[in-house]
Every structure is written in C-alpha cells, then in structure tokens.
UniProtKB/Swiss-Prot annotation:
One of its GO terms (molecular function) is mannitol-1-phosphate 5-dehydrogenase activity. SUPFAM superfamilies: 6-phosphogluconate dehydrogenase C-terminal domain-like, NAD(P)-binding Rossmann-fold domains. GO terms for cellular component: cytosol. NAD(+) binds at L3, I4, H5, F6, G7, A8, G9, N10, I11, G12, C13, G14. It comes from the Bacteria. InterPro entries: 6-PGluconate_DH-like_C_sf (IPR008927), 6PGD_dom2 (IPR013328), Mannitol_DH_C (IPR013118), Mannitol_DH_CS (IPR023027), Mannitol_DH_N (IPR013131), NAD(P)-bd_dom_sf (IPR036291). This is Mannitol-1-phosphate 5-dehydrogenase.
C-alpha cells in the first residue's frame, strides 16, 4: 500500500511520515513549495528527533509539486490511503486535485480512504461535502490527531517532535473489510474522544495562558513548562482538570479512570521542555474561545446547571475576559 499526503510541512514530515512510513511501502508528498519538494527528492531522507531521544530516519519518500499532481497518474493504482495536513482554510485549494484521484479510483473500481489530519472537528466529513462524484469505494474517515512538532524550518537537517502522539480513527466510517493500520487507534465512540481533547486539553491550554497572564505576565513565564515550575500554576491546572472531569463524567458517563489517566498524560506533556510551547500562542483567538458553545462556556454552563463544582471554571472564564480586555 502506498500513501499520498498533501502537505510536506512540519505536520506531514514530523507527524504523518514517522507514524506511517513503516506501514506503507511509499509516501508521496504533495506540496506547492518547490524548495521542500526538491529537498525531499534530492535527499530522500527525513530525520526526526523525539523527546525520548529517539532518532528516526525516513527514506521511502518522494514529493510532487501540487501543479504536477496529474502527471503522476501511473502511481495511483497502488495508492489506497490519502492523508492531508494543510490547514482547514486551505482545503479548498486541493479540491480539483483530489477530485481527479477520486475519479480515477471510481473508474478503476479501487478503494480510497481519505483522512484530513487537521486541528478541527470531523474535518474529513466537512471535506466530503465538497464532492458530488462519490461512490461506495470512496471513504472519508474522521480522525483526531495530536502531536507537538517544533516550528523548526522543514529545510533544516532534522525536525523535533514529542514522542507522544494521538491518532484516533472513527471506525464506523471505514469499509467492513478494512485491515486496520498499526500505530493508529480505532474507536466506535469517536465523539467522546473529541470531547475529551477539546474540554481537557484545548480548553486547559487557553485557560492556563490566561491564568499566567493575569497572575504573573508573559514576561515572567514565556513557555508552558516554565510556568509549571510554579506551585500556584500547578494547583490551578489540577483544580481546573478536576472540575472538567466531574462534568465529563456526569454528562457523558466517561469512566473516571480513563479521564484521570488522560489528565496525568496532559500534565506530563505540559512539563516537557523539549518542545517549547509558547503561552502567547495558546492565548490566541480568545474572543472565539470565550463564545457560547465553545470550550469554556459549554463546560461552565453545564456545571452551573447541574450544581457541579465550578469555581476554577468560572475563574478561567473571568481570566479570559480580562485577557481579552487587555489585548484587543
């Protein structure tokens, strides 16, 4: 099995490639950056250094310029998986090219699985809505992905990423005869997994940034791991996650052991100084994050309506409002 991946940036090379390179025979990257395409085709090598001191070399790769995509039809027979990491707002720019691949697969009665590995909710399903020429051989499968990859220039000698990664697949959207790809996690309760990540990890990120800004300022703590050396910050993180866990257990009946294990995993990642996670970055888009039906108010409102402990959730919302007021 071969793989086509749209996006030869840090996520494509630092996340997708090291996870799938040992599973597929070959990875064809597609990108519109000629320097990256030339580097991959010349060196035939991607080097990865992980937070656990692992060094990974990926050699079963080549790259195509986006505008040359149609010229490589001769390789498409062996491609059964298409993955994408170009940013949700850029998906519209590859519709034409993906459509050509879909038409080819339908014409030749071949299966194709498409996974949008983007930071969003059910992005593959969203991408599917852009196409009308589909049949039962084309599968858009939603995934939940998470891995911190350094913002090092992809043209450097190597990329850095944390050893941890999350790649959860909605099993219900796969063909019944699909042979599961190793290194991925398959679930029939995909929405529950999304819920955990949004309200425990994503919401904590911005809440932590607002808390540090209010109590210490970003001049004292620039990165997450630095702030986690302060006992007051550690206490906030623990109390925040404990209140979220109460809500998720009450609302979705998610097992407490599962939630607490995820909490411990989050805290371990926050404490790592291998990848420097910028607090200012985590505080971005505050107005959106404070809006109704978003990561903060959804949990806070449920806790209040059901008489669950919510002191820290409320504090976080107030911190966010203060940050917004000072950073318009």
């Amino acid at each position: 099995m071969n793989l086509i991946h749209f996006g030869a940036g840090n996520i494509g090379c630092g996340f997708i490639a090291p996870i799938l390179s040992s599973i597929v025979d070959h990875i064809y990257f597609v990108d519109n950056n000629i320097d990256i395409v030339n580097k991959i085709n010349t060196q035939k090598l991607i080097k990865i250094h992980t937070s656990d001191s692992k060094k990974i070399s990926i050699t079963n790769i080549s790259a195509w310029l986006l505008t040359d995509f149609i010229n490589y039809k001769k390789t498409w027979n062996e491609v059964s998986l298409l993955t994408i990491s170009i940013g949700i707002k850029n998906l519209k720019h590859i519709i034409y090219y993906v459509n050509q691949l879909i038409d080819y697969k339908i014409k030749n009665n071949q299966k194709l699985i498409i996974m949008c590995c983007e930071n969003g909710i059910r992005v593959s399903s969203l991408f599917k809505s852009y196409f009308s020429n589909l049949n039962n051989n084309i599968y858009f499968v939603d995934v939940l992905v998470d891995r911190i990859v350094s913002n090092k220039n992809i043209l450097n000698d190597y990329l850095e990423c944390e050893d941890y990664y999350l790649w959860i697949v909605d099993k219900t959207q796969l063909p019944s005869d699909f042979k599961q790809v190793p290194n991925l996690t398959y679930t029939t309760s995909f929405d529950i997994q999304i819920t955990k990540k949004i309200y425990m990890l994503n919401a904590l990120h911005c809440s932590l940034a607002w808390f540090v800004f209010k109590n210490f300022s970003f001049n004292k703590y620039l990165y997450v791991y630095q702030a986690l050396k302060n006992d007051k910050v550690v206490e906030f993180v623990n109390n925040y996650l404990n209140e979220v866990i109460l809500v998720l257990n009450h609302k979705y009946n998610i097992n407490l052991d599962e939630l607490n294990n995820y909490k411990n995993q989050i805290i371990k990642r926050l404490n790592s100084n291998f990848i420097k996670d910028d607090l200012k970055r985590l505080a971005r888009n505050t107005e959106l994050k404070l809006s109704k039906n978003e990561r903060i108010l959804t949990i806070l409102d449920y806790a209040k309506d059901n008489n669950l402990k919510h002191d820290i959730l409320l504090l976080s919302y107030q911190n966010g409002l203060e940050y917004l007021k000072n950073n318009k």
